[in-house]
From Swiss-Prot:
It holds the Pfam family RVT_1. One of its GO terms (molecular function) is endonuclease activity. Its EC number is 2.7.7.49. It is an enzyme of class 2 (transferase). This is Retrovirus-related Pol polyprotein from type-1 retrotransposable element R2. The lineage of its organism: Eukaryota, Metazoa, Ecdysozoa, Arthropoda, Hexapoda. It comes from the Eukaryota. PANTHER family: REVERSE TRANSCRIPTASES (PTHR19446). It comes from Popillia japonica. InterPro entries: DNA/RNA_pol_sf, RT_dom. Residues 45-323 form the Reverse transcriptase domain. PROSITE patterns: RT_POL (PS50878).
């Protein structure tokens, strides 16, 4: 029973997740409605009275230009906006109707099931299984001309009665349709007179999908109940696949297909709609002597117009995938190549190009690659194209490890999607989340050809999820070991998503080079072992860690890096009202001298001895550096000296360790808690460290080149 008072929970459920949109002709916005307590009683009154207020019937339409000649009216897309209050009521009614009425399972559009996957797999399985069995098969893809705009209101009333919708709800729905008007904006400040809407469902109205599906439900039930027609999938006869107004007719018998097509055309004609024969297409393959022979001459008609036939060289598009005589066509990387060239040529900064590829180009590619015919080679080609483009945009070496690209940002990578490992796993997850009560899905998943597809996907996906695989790769590679600690704190990775204030594009690229091991040094695998020594004359391997942390050539810059971070921490502590001493000299009676970076005296709390250190975040964990630094002062000799310097004080020994590659380790959590370090402060100190690392490397390169030039 859908005609009942509205509960407060229904209002809350309808408002939850309601995205802001333009106001209707009454000027009310979604934000205004979600903030007021009026809607429940107000919309309930009009629902129970079966009355549609005049402001709800008045809508406004804006024309959005499409591609092509704008003098042609068909190249404009009308967007009609109704009252937000009415949309709220219709969201509630739509949920009630969906819960009360069970439509035919062949309709996957607007249903709570992964309909695009199921229908695509059903079509591919039908074609491939019939070809394997060398049997006749026919597929007709039908285009309904402006289906949502032309469905008659009388057919909607008929559908509501057929489905047993109660009289109160039916009267309200028919009233909201028959009394509707709209005005079309035709220029700045100008609009047409009111235009009465005599057919079609409202675009953007929450009820429209259910009403259209309700009309189509009669056709789907009629076809399913007709004996003998349909295509065989597993043990089931399936005559039609529907996704909203996208219809596919499946038929094993050539003789019955024209009759089925005529029945469908007549159904739409009686309900104010029509089939577009020129945009429809058919596949027809006859089996003769154990050989499948495609028909190349059109033989099906709609309104005396022949439907085009797909031959061996052609495909047709269905739900974003291309299908031909052999089933789903293998996806290509042509569009990806074109998109990446556009991104690379765009006048954007490096971090903007990276963000565009990661957040827009790759996600746009994901759906098209979730194709039954996808292969490992196609996915590898797509991955290689993306990696190559990112390397050029960020000026990375060809030998940059793949884990630097595919590990999650929280694991120390750039967060790109590894298509080779992700796409098969995504498809398997979608398949495993299917609704087992759907008889069409059950028929699909029991088909032998589907078992072959599933086995192939399992082999492609592997045993380890991509995120785990690449995190392990980061943790076990010489160049990237230690970056997995970026997951310890958001401050270690925030700059990858959003360039810090004051950074140039060059600063961002240099920071990426540091993370990925791309700062130029002599100690790289391609150099002979004898040519990897430091050009500063210290006789050590010229690794990035050596240059930044140990080489005496840039010792002054290292000291300035340390002092800047220590000063910033001291300034923060002073802003809290604490007394701060920087590098105090604390001498023990036996002559030992201690010079901690900062001592913070907090009123009513133990004083904090904080020594700052920038350590290389590599094979030696930063936790070990933290413990070593703590042991420097956490012993009896220092406590005796500190007690003489500050009588009556107690002390906490809490170092602050920063990773040279911008890592804030978990071991700093006690220090951060005691000294009230915010995420913003931690991030700013790490950003300073990263910029200083770039300066250190530049100074080193200048120094060694000057030395070589002088020699």
């Amino acid at each position: 029973h859908t005609y009942r008072p509205i509960a407060r929970e229904e209002i809350q459920c309808a408002i939850k997740g309601w995205k802001p949109s333009a106001p209707g002709s009454d000027g009310l916005t979604v934000q205004a409605i979600t903030r007021t307590r009026l809607p429940r009683n107000f919309v309930q009154l009009h629902l129970l009275r079966g009355h549609v207020p005049t402001p709800w019937t008045a809508m406004r339409t804006t024309l959005i230009p499409k591609d092509g000649d704008l003098e042609n009216p068909s190249n404009w897309r009308p967007i009609t906006i109704a009252s937000a209050l009415q949309r709220l009521l219709h969201r509630i009614l739509a949920k009630r109707l969906e819960a009360a009425v069970e439509l035919h399972p062949a309709q996957k559009g607007y249903a709570r099931i992964d309909g695009t996957l199921v229908n695509s797999l059903l079509l591919d399985t039908y074609i491939s299984s019939r070809r394997e069995q060398r049997k006749t098969y026919n597929v007709v893809s039908l285009d309904v001309r402006k289906a949502f705009d032309t469905v008659s209101h009388s057919s909607i009333c008929r559908a509501l009665q057929r489905l047993g919708i109660d009289e109160g709800t039916s009267n309200y729905i028919t009233g909201s349709l028959s009394d509707s008007t709209t005005t079309i904006r035709v220029g700045p400040g100008s609009q047409t007179r009111k235009i009465c809407i005599r057919r079609g469902v409202k675009q953007g109205d929450p009820l429209s999908p259910f009403l259209f599906n309700a009309v189509l439900d009669e056709l789907l039930c009629s076809l399913q109940s007709t004996p003998g027609i349909g295509g065989t999938i597993g043990e089931e006869k399936i005559p039609v696949l529907a996704f909203a107004d996208d219809l596919l007719l499946l038929e094993d018998n050539d003789v019955l297909l024209p009759t089925t097509l005529a029945t469908v055309a007549n159904f739409f004609r009686l309900r104010g709609m029509s089939l577009n024969a020129k945009k429809s297409v058919s596949i027809s393959v006859a089996a003769s002597g154990g050989v499948c022979i495609p028909r190349t001459k059109p033989f099906l008609r709609v309104d005396n117009v022949l439907l085009p036939v797909t031959d061996r060289m052609q495909t047709f598009r269905y739900l974003g995938h291309f299908f031909g005589l052999s089933g789903a066509a293998k996806p290509t990387v042509y569009n990806l190549s074109r998109w990446l060239k556009c991104v690379e040529a765009a006048p954007l900064k490096p971090e903007q190009k990276l963000s565009l590829i990661r957040e827009h180009v790759v996600p746009k590619l994901l759906y098209g690659l979730q194709n039954p015919s996808v292969t490992a080679r196609t996915l590898r080609d797509a991955d290689k194209l993306i990696r190559t483009t990112v390397k050029r945009c960020l000026h990375l070496h060809l030998h940059t490890p793949n884990q630097c690209f595919y590990a999650r940002v929280r694991d120390g990578g750039l967060g790109l999607t590894d298509l080779r490992r992700s796409i098969p796993r995504i498809m398997l997850d979608r398949i495993n989340a299917r609704r087992s009560s759907d008889p069409m899905a059950v028929a699909l998943f029991s088909c032998p050809s589907f078992d072959h597809l599933r086995g192939r996907l399992v082999a492609l996906a592997g045993d380890v999820p991509p995120s785990h695989f690449w995190r392990e790769a980061i943790a076990n590679h010489t160049t990237t070991k230690g970056l997995e600690a970026a997951s310890d704190d958001p401050a270690s990775r925030s700059w990858i998503f959003r360039k810090p204030y004051g950074w140039s594009g060059k600063d961002f690229v240099r920071a990426i080079h540091l993370r990925t091991g791309n700062l130029p040094t002599k100690a790289i695998p391609s150099n002979p072992a004898g040519e990897r020594l430091c050009r500063g004359g210290c006789g050590k391997q010229a690794t990035i860690s050596h240059v930044l942390q140990r080489c005496p050539v840039v010792q002054p810059e290292r000291i300035r890096r340390h002092n800047e971070i220590a000063r910033k921490i001291a300034a923060h502590c002073r802003s809290k009202g604490w007394t701060v001493e920087e590098e105090p000299h604390i001498r023990h009676p036996l002559g030992h001298l201690y010079k901690p970076d900062i001592v913070i005296h907090r009123e009513g709390l133990p004083s904090v001895v904080c020594d700052v250190q920038v350590s290389w975040d590599g094979y030696e964990p930063l936790d070990e550096a933290w413990r070593n630094k703590q042991r420097t002062y956490d012993h009896d000799l220092f406590r005796t000296a500190a007690g003489r310097r500050w009588p009556g004080k107690t002390f906490l020994h809490l170092p602050a360790i920063l990773g040279a590659r911008g890592i804030w380790p978990r071991c700093n959590s006690e220090t951060a808690s005691a000294l009230a370090f915010t995420n913003q402060l931690k991030a700013s100190w790490l950003h300073s460290c990263l910029k200083w690392d770039s300066t250190l490397h530049t100074s080193f390169m200048r120094a060694v080149w000057s030395r070589q030039a002088g020699a």
